Swiss-Prot record:
Span list, region 3-hydroxyacyl-CoA dehydrogenase: 310-710
GO cellular component terms, semicolon-separated: cytoplasm
UniProt keyword annotations, A-Z: Cytoplasm, Fatty acid metabolism, Isomerase, Lipid degradation, Lipid metabolism, Lyase, Multifunctional enzyme, NAD, Oxidoreductase
Gene behind this protein: fadJ
Pathway the protein contributes to: Lipid metabolism; fatty acid beta-oxidation
Subunit structure: Heterotetramer of two alpha chains (FadJ) and two beta chains (FadI).
Protein name: Fatty acid oxidation complex subunit alpha
Coiled-coil intervals, chain numbering: none
UniProt keyword Lyase present: yes
Main location as per UniProt: cytoplasm
InterPro entries, A to Z: 3-OHacyl-CoA_DH_NAD-bd, 3HC_DH_C, 6-PGluconate_DH-like_C_sf, ClpP/crotonase-like_dom_sf, Enoyl-CoA_hyd/isom_CS, Enoyl-CoA_hydra/iso, FA_oxidation_alpha_subunit, FadJ
Native organism: Shewanella frigidimarina (strain NCIMB 400)
Amino acid sequence: MSMEKTFNLARRDDGIAILTMDVPGETMNTLKEQFGPEISEILTEIKADSSIKGLVVISGKADSFVAGADITMLAACKNEEQAKTLSQQGHVVFAELEGLSIPVVAAINGACLGGGLELALACHLRVCSDDKKTMLGVPEVQLGLLPGGGGTQRLPRLVGITTALDMMLTGKQIRPKQALKMGLVNDVVPNSILLETAVELAKKGKQAAKPVVQSKINQFLESTSFTRDIIFDQARKQVLKKTQGNYPAPAKIIDCVRQGMNKGMVKGLEVEATHFANLVMSKESAALRSLFFATTEMKKETGAEGAVPRKVKKVMVLGGGLMGGGIASVTTTKAKIPARVKDISEQGLSNALSYAYKLLDKGVKRRHMTPIARDNIMALMTTTTEYTGIKDADIVVEAVFEDLALKHKMVQDVERECGENTIFASNTSSLPIGQIAAAASRPENVIGLHYFSPVEKMPLVEVIAHKTTSPETIATTVAFARKQGKTPIVVQDGAGFYVNRILALYMNEAAQLLLEGQRIEHLDRALVKFGFPVGPMTLLDEVGIDVGAKISPILEKELGDRFKAPAAFDKLLADDRKGRKNGKGFYQYGPKAKKAKLVDESVYKVLDILIASDKEAKGVAERCTIQMLNEAVRCLEEGIIASARDGDIGAIFGIGFPPFLGGPFRYIDTLGASNLVATLQGYQSLYGDRFAPCDTLVKMASDGSQFYKK
């Protein structure tokens, strides 16, 4: 029976007891509601045993201390009162641990996150291993929550208000050396001596609190309630600017710290429990948690049921441009798989190597990586202008121009030069994969692998299967994309696939509003306020106006008139406006451009636009996004995407659809299909059939159905 316990206490001869946490049957430790009584029972036992002179809290898992609280228990909360009780139970247990008269040391190896760090903060001292898997942080904000186990109170008292706010508001994870420098841990040692170091610390007894390590200016600002309020007000302004008021958690985190530092820890904990409960029941946190569960669930899937992925040991990338260089870079850096880049020009190859080197060198400059580690990764990337050294390539990723004839030649070259099982993966952004596979003698090996730019930053890839792509090819490509650190969604073949298809209508509508006289900066601000990371005009400048102009005719030809792009694109290209890449777009670039982004007013003249009065921001955002919602449902209707879940993940990770809304499908459930259909029909009467609601939405409006169960 004792084997089934999570917490086990072992007494040593030297008077130090070891409390080992090891959740049975799970790879990582997470804190669960039912652990409270078990911990309290052990703490009572410790208090009653005078032979115990010190306590070390350690994990029984090889690679993690505690990865956080088990967030599935939050879904069971039916109201704020129940959620508040969860937080308060954590407060009681951690206060009991902190209140022990003997020294308590946390011995940390691996992930120490969320409730795990709060557990460590309740200990009197902390020592962590220097292992690369050891990371400390409070990432609750990423789930629309706040640290509800006393973290908002203990963390600022340990590392200072400014540092604590930075950790809690970003959810960033701290490496061991950084944790030592900021005073979050008392020592960093190799994992082999972690336990003994913690034992020695416990033997030394409780130590006087060290002064918080911080700059003179922060010392001054944190010294009185008046100056502390300057920090809180500044933090609040920055948060509001960043979140546009769409995420309630950051403001509540600031309030918890403010109240606790100004009115004492008891008040702070009370506020923390109240705010935590409010956030647990918020629609924003529900959406973010659903996204977390969806991506976790997706990681277990192969993309093709029953298929076993082949091992990928060598990769070739065709094309040394920005996309090719980025793909080769994530292959070597993240997947640690050798990549050979082929380009017709030495300059292209040089650019690809330089691109990868600069990305790695950033890590060296930030001390996240040694120069030797950088050079070892660079050694995995080789280049060629011919088809040499690729006979044993398992995957060839093609990243050349959007030209069907050129891609046909690439397929034939690869089939001639490589083995019969080599996968040909095209990074096309718009050409149907079936058309590319038409030139193949082994079409079952041809697949789409659509990355988003910049490759090293954008988390999504679309894995596109055409009608005869083999399940093994799909599974191997999905597994390869995951090794690159990507979130892959499997979509079926069709012009624009999923992400670019829903994005095109959004961009077209923004361009239409521009031609109607809406100012560029007003359009961008309206969509940023709605929750997108950047506005549509900024995005078009970044992606390239020429790229947008190339994709639109393909989509119009394959999918119909609703994809017809406004005449703006042709006029812009005639004026040689491609966006940031050539320093000429909707905004000013180059040395003349100031730090604050300024619109290039000459665009209005090029497009013969007469500036009109600003339409209401909400109306602008609605008109741009409503077609995206409609088209996402069409993609599900046509089988382009397999599920609403995949559609939500694709939109959030591919184009930055506001995460707090949960994705297009979850947002439609929030709006209600009948309301959405009525709004679409209203726009249809004003602007034409491009706003006609799709059949599935009309059916859902009549029968009241939803994509997700309540």
